[in-house]
Each structure stands twice: as structure tokens, then as C-alpha cells.
């Protein structure tokens, strides 16, 4: 369950295959193609954000995809956290997407 000091990170927020009006919140330079929840979890863990994986939940715009989301500590603006997580996933995948 989400606490006040946590932010929800849905995979669509970092998905380079989605347009901004489809839910992507990061610039293309910090986005990745089809991000997986476990990639987001591992990137947040490496950044020290104390992630929690919540399964069986679907983003309202993609109600059929119940891959879940990741809760991370709220240590700053959401866009900054998303950019850091996206950049870390790119690094984990081995470079530019």
C-alpha cells in the first residue's frame, strides 16, 4: 500500500514506445523500449530508493496489462526520479536504446 513518502512508478512512464499523451513522463533520452517492472525495481534499488514491487495491478490506461508497479521513496520531484531510473535502466541494458 502506498505511503505518503512513496511515489508510484508505472512502466508506461518510462516507455519509449509511448507518446507523452499516452502516459510517458520522461524525455526520449531517458526512456527505454518496453521497460519491465523488474528492471525498474533493480534500477531503483541501485539508486537507493528502497523499491517495493506491487503485482497484479494495471495502469488505468492499460487495464488489461496487470504487470504491476514499483513504489519508491519520494526524495525529490517525480520527473527527476524517473529520469534517474530511466538513465540507470539504459546503463543496465548496456548503453543507448
Swiss-Prot record:
Family matches, as HAMAP family: SRP19
One GO cellular component term noted in the UniProt record for this chain: signal recognition particle
Entry keyword annotation includes Membrane: no
Purpose: Involved in targeting and insertion of nascent membrane proteins into the cytoplasmic membrane. Binds directly to 7S RNA and mediates binding of the 54 kDa subunit of the SRP.
InterPro entries hit by this protein: Signal_recog_particle_SRP19 (IPR002778), SRP19-like_sf (IPR036521), SRP19_arc-type (IPR022938)
Protein family per UniProt: Belongs to the SRP19 family.
Protein name: Signal recognition particle 19 kDa protein
Subunit structure: Part of the signal recognition particle protein translocation system, which is composed of SRP and FtsY. Archaeal SRP consists of a 7S RNA molecule of 300 nucleotides and two protein subunits: SRP54 and SRP19.
Taxonomic superkingdom: Archaea
One record GO biological process: SRP-dependent cotranslational protein targeting to membrane
Major localisation: cytoplasm
Key words of the record: Cytoplasm, Ribonucleoprotein, RNA-binding, Signal recognition particle
